[in-house]
């Protein structure tokens, strides 16, 4: 989930650091997680007679189970002095081939210019009611100067395919603090958006410049603090925080391993302000409980019907930045795999799964999120690389496929009954039915999985899904009811104890 962390940092900065009253700015921020410096963000604004250019660049170093991963991403946004949007770019580097999205704005609507997007408007719902970066800066400065205690507006989220994002800031007080050698009176604001259930506490100058931002991102407290350039860059030299253990979901009752388990029952509870729903898809069937949680039944030997919308979704067969089926090497790899006459489609798909598992022979956390072609060439990766390469094989076979994100049960040091770890696998559509395939496990699929979301990974949907998953870290509870008929919890299905 390291790329999800990177995207949450980017989201915080999308709705925070771009606020400034200056026409020219050069701001450096240090990023810390659990008090450990781990990266920086650099934002600049440059003006010419015809254009205003806002740029941000972020670098992070984190430890994933003893492997240090370096992540970087950045955005640019160009507009004219009247606030007319002209051009924007998003670049994400998670250890594989960098992903780049380019947008223009015909008739004010963002359009993805990447080849796989088909040059179509990506957000018909954006409309005219959103603000560009320079408009946000001017709007916030004016509202603060007017003594406003609540500020609300809409902008575009570049890390979610230019999805409209509603921001609300509430004034909660003031404090004096030394900032870059000067003592300033700062406003304390609480920021929330419709894209996240995580509240962010901010300090801002009277001109709207962000001085600090603090949020509990599930892995611990994350702080983004205005500093000088040297201090910001030094954050990359410090020992990075170890984050893998913080993503584990403990369980108090479970069989030793679930690799061969076919059926299981769970209760799942979300401890968030925002309501969450679990998908009823593939091997997973969900029932809402009166207590507000969910009863989840897994039958790894079964699938579930697709909706009419899913059956008609062209993105499930198309090339994307991560599932790059237009790559010659990827096409050649799957074309040269031997087929077995008489195989059913399900059996043929499982042969693709085994081929991917064997090819990605270097199981490593060193790549946060590589593409299918990255996984093919490097033969390295974790669950994400296995999932996208297998999805590419399915799509090249003419079968709609998507990425599943959720939890998988696995042994974990310090956890008597193992733990659930965040995970990715692949779903494929066969004769109108979704089937689950996990190229990192011994069998096609097993009952040690819990599905939280699915994504075609087209445009910005993959990044959005990953960042949303991070919002659940530390806010999700799982209880095991039974595995392969063995009852492990005698509570009623509502989790309220024996009701007899």
Please report, for each region that a protein language model flagged, where it lies by residue:
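Hydrophobic/aromatic-rich core segments of domains that either
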Residues: 186-188, 196, 202, 386-475
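Catalytic-site/binding-pocket detector for metal-dependent nucleotidyl cyclases
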Residues: 132, 138-140
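Bacterial N-terminal signal peptides
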Residues: 4-16
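Acidic, serine/threonine-rich low-complexity disordered tracts
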Residues: 18-116, 124-126, 141-303, 443, ...
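Secondary-structure boundary elements
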Residues: 136-137, 302-381, 389, 458, ...
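Hydrophobic ligand-binding cavity/cleft-lining segments
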Residues: 129
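Flexible, glycine-rich surface segments
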Residues: 149, 158-160, 358-413, 422
């Amino acid at each position: 989930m390291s790329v999800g962390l990177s995207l949450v940092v980017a989201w915080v900065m999308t709705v925070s650091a771009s606020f400034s009253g200056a026409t020219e700015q050069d701001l450096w921020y240090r990023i810390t997680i659990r008090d450990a410096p781990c990266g920086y963000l650099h934002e600049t604004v440059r003006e010419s007679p015809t254009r205003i250019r806002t740029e941000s660049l972020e670098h992070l170093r984190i430890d994933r189970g003893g492997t240090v991963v370096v992540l970087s991403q950045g955005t640019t946004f160009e507009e004219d002095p009247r606030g007319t949007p002209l051009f924007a770019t998003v670049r994400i580097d998670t250890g594989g081939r960098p992903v780049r999205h380019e947008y223009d704005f015909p008739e004010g609507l963002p359009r993805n210019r990447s080849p796989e997007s088909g040059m179509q408007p990506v957000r018909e719902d954006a409309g005219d009611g959103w603000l560009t970066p320079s408009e946000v800066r001017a709007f916030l400065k004016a509202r603060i100067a007017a003594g406003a205690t609540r500020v609300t507006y809409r902008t575009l989220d570049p890390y979610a395919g230019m999805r409209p994002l509603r921001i609300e800031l509430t004034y909660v007080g003031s404090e004096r603090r030394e900032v870059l050698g000067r003592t300033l009176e700062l406003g304390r604001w609480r920021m929330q958006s419709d894209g996240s259930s995580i509240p962010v506490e901010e300090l801002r100058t009277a001109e709207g410049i962000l001085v600090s931002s603090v949020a509990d991102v599930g892995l611990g407290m994350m702080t983004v603090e205005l500093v000088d350039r040297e201090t910001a860059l030094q954050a990359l030299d410090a020992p990075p925080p170890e984050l893998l253990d913080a993503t584990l979901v403990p369980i108090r009752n479970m069989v030793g391993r679930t690799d061969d388990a076919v059926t299981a029952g769970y209760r799942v509870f979300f401890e968030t302000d925002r309501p969450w729903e679990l998908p009823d898809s593939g091997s997973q069937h969900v029932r809402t409980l009166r207590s507000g949680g969910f009863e989840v039944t897994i039958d790894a030997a079964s699938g579930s019907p697709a909706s009419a919308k899913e059956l008609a979704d062209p993105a499930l067969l198309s090339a994307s930045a991560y599932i790059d089926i237009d790559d010659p090497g990827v096409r050649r790899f799957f074309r040269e795999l031997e087929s077995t006459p008489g195989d059913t489609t399900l059996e043929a798909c499982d042969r693709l799964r085994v081929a991917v598992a064997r090819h990605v022979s270097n199981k490593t956390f060193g790549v946060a999120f590589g593409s299918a072609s990255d996984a093919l060439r490097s033969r390295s990766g974790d669950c994400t690389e296995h999932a996208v390469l297998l999805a590419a094989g399915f799509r090249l076979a003419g079968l709609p496929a998507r990425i599943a994100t959720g939890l998988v049960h696995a042994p974990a040091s310090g956890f008597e009954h193992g733990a659930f770890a965040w995970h990715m696998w692949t779903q494929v559509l066969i004769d109108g039915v979704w089937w689950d395939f996990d190229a990192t496990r011994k069998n096609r699929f097993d009952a040690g999985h819990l599905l939280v979301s699915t994504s075609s990974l087209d445009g910005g949907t993959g990044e959005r899904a990953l960042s949303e998953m991070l919002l659940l870290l530390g806010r999700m509870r799982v209880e095991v009811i039974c595995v392969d008929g063995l009852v492990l919890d005698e509570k009623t299905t509502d989790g309220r104890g024996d009701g007899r």
